Amino acid sequence: MADLIPLAQARCVPRKGSDHKLGEARLAELLPQIPGWELSEGGQALSRTFRFKDYYATMAFVNALAWIAHREDHHPDLGVHYDRAVVRFSTHDVGGLSENDFICAAKTSALTEQLP
């Protein structure tokens, strides 16, 4: 799916079971498509810290991200602070990373281009 259209324009689909867990080769293909994100927890999650000028900007980002998570039915773990938000994606149902994590990471990155 992500090979045909940009990740930020793709949609999440339900993924359950270890057969949907991405292997190292696929992770290496997808990671360059989401600059600023890094593999964490031994390659089991994606994370990125987004920095903002103040709490209002941080919360605007978090609220917009909540809408994306709701629409895609794929929810991140968040650490929310005055001037930053730490975003972590992983697919618990596959025991690691799935394409849904990369799709949502790309959509999350795109938010920073749209918010003040």
UniProtKB/Swiss-Prot annotation:
SUPFAM superfamilies from the UniProt entry: PCD-like
E.C. number: 4.2.1.96
InterPro entries, alphabetized: PCD_sf, Pterin_deHydtase
GO molecular function, one term: 4-alpha-hydroxytetrahydrobiopterin dehydratase activity
Pfam families hit by this protein: Pterin_4a
Reaction catalyzed: (4aS,6R)-4a-hydroxy-L-erythro-5,6,7,8-tetrahydrobiopterin = (6R)-L-erythro-6,7-dihydrobiopterin + H2O
Keywords: Lyase
Any Gene Ontology biological process: tetrahydrobiopterin biosynthetic process
Keyword set includes Ubl conjugation: no
Family to which the UniProt record says this protein belongs: Belongs to the pterin-4-alpha-carbinolamine dehydratase family.
Name this polypeptide is given: Putative pterin-4-alpha-carbinolamine dehydratase
